[in-house]
UniProtKB/Swiss-Prot annotation:
PTM annotation, UniProt: Undergoes a tyrosination/detyrosination cycle, the cyclic removal and re-addition of a C-terminal tyrosine residue by the enzymes tubulin tyrosine carboxypeptidase (TTCP) and tubulin tyrosine ligase (TTL), respectively.
One cellular component term from this protein's GO annotations in UniProt: microtubule
Protein name: Tubulin alpha chain
PANTHER family from the UniProt entry: TUBULIN (PTHR11588)
Site (Involved in polymerization): Y161
Molecular function terms from GO: GTP binding; hydrolase activity; structural constituent of cytoskeleton
Amino acid sequence: ITNACFEPANQMVKCDPRHGKYMACCMLYRGDVVPKDVNAAIATIKTKRTIQFVDWCPTGFKVGINYQPPTVVPGGDLAKVQRAVCMLSNTTAIAEAWARLDHKFDLMYAKRAFVHWYVGEGMEEGEFSEAREDLAALEKDYEEVGVDSVEGEAEEEGEEY
C-alpha cells in the first residue's frame, strides 16, 4: 500500500508526482500495520530512487501509525479494510496543476465571468489580479526549486575527480 501512494492514479490533485521532486512526505498508516514493514517499504523507495527529493531535504519522510482499524460509515460507499494509509506530500509536480488553474482563471477573468458576484459581496476587482500574481509567483517558486535541485546535482557530478 505504501507504493500505491506514489501512483498518479491515487493522487487527490491531477498531477504526475514522477515529474517533480518531493520536499516533504508524511505517511499516516492506520490498522494492522507492522512498523518493520513500513520502514522496509520506505527504505526500498529510497534505495530504488522511486521518488526524488530536493537536494536540501534528502530524508524527507515522517511516519505515523495508528493501530485502530480504519472506520467505515454505515451505509457508506467504502468497504471495510484491515489497513489504510494516507500520504500528505509537498512536491514540485503541483506546479502543473497550478498552471492549469492559472489558464482557467485567465479565460474566465477575461470574460469577467462571476466577477460581479464577488464584487457584490464586497471584494474589489484588484484582489483578483493580486491573487493571480500570487499564484503565478508560487508556481514560479516551485518550478525554480525543481530546476535548482537538478542543476545542483549536475554540478556535484561534474566535480568528481
